[in-house]
């Protein structure tokens, strides 16, 4: 494995363990050239998914692009990278389970919003403000009102009615 610091092509594995989701292996490595440590992830090479954009363009699904969008929405929020990785893992798993080679970007956006709403309201609103392309402040306020209403309904539910975190 090539070192990201010095480019040396040999490293040794210090620690190896499956990720929480069990779909990849996390390896802690040490470069044999500069002795710096870095982490790699090994995962099964699955068939590629194609994302169909709103304008009809098609492009390959990139989990890193999805993760970056989540990181941006959760910037300066108390949300760990591990939780965001778990969300991306869950969304990717759900997309692959559809057995459809092409997935509409709107479907992916709705999956993200559903999970962010449960995870962090501020991150949800940030993501929604970009994803939903609100026409004006009034439509944005309507979305906030809907979010608050959904949360109030959740608080009114009885024991066991709460939604579990993904």
Swiss-Prot record:
PROSITE patterns for the chain: ATP_CONE (PS51161)
Pfam families on file: ATP-cone, Zn_ribbon_NrdR
GO BP term, example: negative regulation of DNA-templated transcription
Co-factor: note: Binds 1 zinc ion.
Cofactor(s) required for function per UniProt: Zn(2+)
InterPro entries per the UniProt record, alphabetical: ATP-cone_dom, NrdR-like_N, RNR_NrdR-like
Keyword annotations: ATP-binding, DNA-binding, Metal-binding, Nucleotide-binding, Repressor, Transcription, Transcription regulation, Zinc, Zinc-finger
Highest taxon in the source lineage: Bacteria
Domain ATP-cone: 49-139
ZnF start-end (unnamed): 3-34
Gene Ontology molecular function terms on file: ATP binding; DNA binding; zinc ion binding
Family that this chain belongs to: Belongs to the NrdR family.
Function comment: Negatively regulates transcription of bacterial ribonucleotide reductase nrd genes and operons by binding to NrdR-boxes.
The protein's name: Transcriptional repressor NrdR
Organism whose genome encodes this protein: Pelotomaculum thermopropionicum (strain DSM 13744 / JCM 10971 / SI)
Organism lineage: Bacteria, Bacillati, Bacillota, Clostridia, Eubacteriales
């Amino acid at each position: 494995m090539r070192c990201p610091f010095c480019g040396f092509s040999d490293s040794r594995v210090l620690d190896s363990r499956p990720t929480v989701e069990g779909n990849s292996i996390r390896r802690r490595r040490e470069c044999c050239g500069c002795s710096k440590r870095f982490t790699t992830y090994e995962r099964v090479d699955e068939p590629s998914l194609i994302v169909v954009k709103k304008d009809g363009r098609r492009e390959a699904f990139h989990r890193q692009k999805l993760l970056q969008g989540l990181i941006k929405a959760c910037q300066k929020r108390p949300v760990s990278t591990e939780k965001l990785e778990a969300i991306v893992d869950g969304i990717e798993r759900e997309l692959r389970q559809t057995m459809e080679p092409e997935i509409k970007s709107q479907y992916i956006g709705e999956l993200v919003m559903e999970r962010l709403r449960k995870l962090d309201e501020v991150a949800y609103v940030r993501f929604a403000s970009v994803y939903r392309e609100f026409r004006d402040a009034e439509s944005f306020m309507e979305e906030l009102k809907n979010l608050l209403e959904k949360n109030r309904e959740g608080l009114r539910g009885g024991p066991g009615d709460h939604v579990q975190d993904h």
